[in-house]
């Protein structure tokens, strides 16, 4: 199985790719998908993809779901696209593995 994130041990940071579906019935991580040999977490968000609402919804949902501060999550790529890369700061790799593994079925 491909690794679903890139982890930097020196900075305690991780890069995670997500595929976002806006206008969903509920905020939910739906599993994973591989696109062009790159693994993405599938994330449904209720917010509309306009004026940054979906991006804000992504940060709010992931912070709450993963028990992280909102300031530790940043969208660094794909602000106007459904395929995004997020940076998670100040996260232990063991905790990140625990989070990711909880969604693998």
UniProtKB/Swiss-Prot annotation:
GO terms for cellular component: cytoplasm. It holds the Pfam family DUF167. It comes from the Bacteria. SUPFAM superfamilies: YggU-like. Transmembrane segments: none annotated. Belongs to the UPF0235 family. This is UPF0235 protein RT0827. It comes from Rickettsia typhi (strain ATCC VR-144 / Wilmington).
């Amino acid at each position: 199985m491909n690794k679903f994130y890139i982890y930097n041990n020196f900075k305690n940071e991780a890069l995670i790719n997500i595929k976002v579906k806006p206008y969903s019935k509920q905020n939910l991580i739906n599993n994973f998908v591989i696109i062009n040999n790159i693994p993405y977490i599938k994330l449904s968000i209720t917010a509309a993809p306009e004026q940054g609402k979906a991006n804000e919804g992504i940060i709010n949902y992931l912070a709450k779901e993963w028990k992280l501060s909102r300031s530790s999550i940043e969208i660094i790529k794909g602000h106007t696209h459904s395929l995004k890369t997020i940076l998670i700061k100040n996260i232990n790799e063991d905790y990140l593995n625990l989070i990711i593994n909880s969604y693998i079925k």
